[in-house]
């Protein structure tokens, strides 16, 4: 069995990934930004010996470093960074009403945070001998998906996709596979009830992709169903 770390495990895709991995007997380090807002995760963990909850706020460098210190040198086979932020009024954003402070906040969560997590836990992934780092991005990050508005979310996800690609190049000699994932349009708090797939379907697809990755796949951008997503 593997050890999997889920960053952003309190709800939606992250919670479902925690559920699926733990039910198969894997050890899951489930990371929550706010321990007081993790009731669903707490309930899931109470019925499983395989789930360890850790506080990790991806927007705060000190929180990431503290989590890394608590986890220590334990080997981690896969890290899936689910945590993200849509960045206020996404459907109504225009060049005239963008909140620049909100843009900075979203960049910190969606782009800089995943880079800091990668840096903090690189040795944990390396020690597994075949580590996987998957960063959830979005189809809205792709130049092949032209869509107006949503400046804040789209640009910060485009940036983190590039972060993933660069990490794959820089870690080419390390035993770590880096991948970028479009999880689908998912029925979560962010995606809404009209979305195309459930969190269960998305999580299952993500797990299938990870299980089939090889080193030569590092740097690829995937859809939840296993297809390569064009950049």
Regions found by a protein language model. Give the residues of each.
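Conserved Rossmann-fold cofactor-binding substructure of NAD(P)-dependent oxidoreductases
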Residues: 59-73
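C-terminal helical subdomain
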Residues: 180-183, 192-231
